[in-house]
């Protein structure tokens, strides 16, 4: 990837193999995420039967120093527990941004909100096309489930698919695998 012209707004054109979008210069380490991704994943947790889900994630750049982020998931298993294939499961919205770290390496900050009463801030690192995130702050409403910590790993696999894994500590149970998926790019 190469950074091209800079505009007066402080953004750079990111010339990637899959997209050319107005991308703020601070977001160049995340340029590989920009676009819409779609695929399938598996989920589970202690006390919860395993399940399959479909997902679409969009990372959008508009020239400002944060990527907009929206994720939608839907049931992709046989009918169970009142769920039918295609019925909505979860939504996340938020922003991803990059700040300079004390050691000069980029620090990724992710702010997410969920309709079930949780807002999260993750802080982590980006190394090439791998992003490691750990909870920095988690805020819950009085009626939200008792999630206490989460870690996420995102990265490109086999050159072009976006894969991730989310581990979670909740309801007094230890940190364990919760969700993982592999998504392919469907648009820039």
Swiss-Prot record:
* Chain sites annotated for binding heme b: 178
**What are the coiled-coil residue ranges?**
none
Lineage per the UniProt record: Bacteria, Bacillati, Actinomycetota, Actinomycetes, Frankiales
Native species: Frankia casuarinae (strain DSM 45818 / CECT 9043 / HFP020203 / CcI3)
Spell out the protein name for this chain: Peroxynitrite isomerase
Write out the domain note.
Forms a 10-stranded antiparallel beta-barrel structure able to accommodate a hydrophobic ligand in its interior. In fact, this fold hosts the heme group, which is located in a wide surface cleft.
* EC number assigned by the record: 5.99.-.-
What are the UniProt keywords, alphabetically? Heme, Iron, Isomerase, Metal-binding
Q: In which pathway does it act?
A: Nitrogen metabolism
Q: Which domain of life is it from?
A: Bacteria
User: Which chemical reaction does it catalyze?
Assistant: peroxynitrite = nitrate
Motif GXWXGXG location, chain numbering: 35-41
What class does this enzyme belong to in the EC scheme? isomerase
């Amino acid at each position: 990837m190469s950074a091209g012209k800079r505009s007066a707004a402080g953004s750079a054109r990111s010339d990637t193999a899959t997209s050319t979008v107005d991308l703020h210069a601070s977001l160049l380490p995340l340029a590989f995420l920009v676009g819409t991704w779609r695929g399938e994943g598996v989920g589970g947790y202690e006390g919860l039967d395993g399940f399959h889900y479909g997902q679409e994630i969009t990372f959008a750049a508009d020239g400002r120093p944060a990527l907009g982020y929206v994720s939608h998931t839907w049931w992709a298993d046989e009918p169970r527990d009142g769920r039918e294939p295609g019925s909505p499961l979860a939504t996340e919205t938020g922003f991803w941004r990059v700040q300079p770290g004390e050691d000069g390496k980029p620090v990724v900050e992710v702010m997410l909100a969920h309709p079930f009463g949780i807002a999260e801030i993750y802080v982590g690192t980006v190394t090439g096309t791998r992003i490691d995130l750990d909870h920095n702050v988690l805020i819950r409403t009085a009626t939200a489930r008792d999630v206490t910590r989460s870690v996420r790993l995102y990265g490109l696999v086999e050159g072009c698919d976006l894969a991730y894994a989310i581990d979670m500590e909740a309801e007094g149970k230890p940190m364990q695998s919760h969700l993982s998926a592999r998504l392919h790019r469907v648009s820039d």
